[in-house]
């Protein structure tokens, strides 16, 4: 059991899809806790493989990735795994927020953001 009396296997599995190494590391460090299991991939191809095998509870998804746009991946996730929650993280394109939410993202988090904003967004999406 963890400190909050949840069984370890009841922890939320989170997939971070982010190609920038520093940002991915910051996200992993910010999310490191007994309530979450955090995995990271660098591109959409690996994200699709991971989701098909592991079906995480939440995907933190960058928009501009080496092999495509995260917005396009949202459609795939919502069609195949509607129960998976999605938070789009982006700072490049202001129009991405409207597109991400219209496509099915549960929340949009604009870079840069604080650890508190990240945790608040995750709490709102998962609860």
Regions found by a protein language model. Name each.
Residues 20-39:
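Two-component/phosphorelay signaling modules centered on CheY-like receiver
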């Amino acid at each position: 059991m963890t400190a909050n009396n949840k069984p370890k296997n009841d922890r939320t599995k989170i997939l971070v899809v982010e190609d920038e190494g520093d940002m991915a590391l910051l996200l992993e460090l910010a999310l490191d806790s007994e309530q979450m299991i955090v995995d990271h991939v660098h591109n959409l191809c690996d994200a699709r493989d991971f989701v098909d095998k592991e079906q995480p509870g939440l995907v933190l998804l960058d928009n501009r990735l080496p092999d495509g746009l995260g917005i396009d991946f949202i459609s795939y996730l919502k069609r195949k795994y509607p129960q998976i929650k999605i938070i789009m993280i982006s700072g490049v394109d202001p129009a991405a927020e409207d597109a991400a939410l219209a496509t099915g993202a549960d929340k949009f988090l604009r870079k840069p953001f604080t650890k508190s904003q990240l945790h608040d967004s995750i709490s709102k999406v998962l609860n």
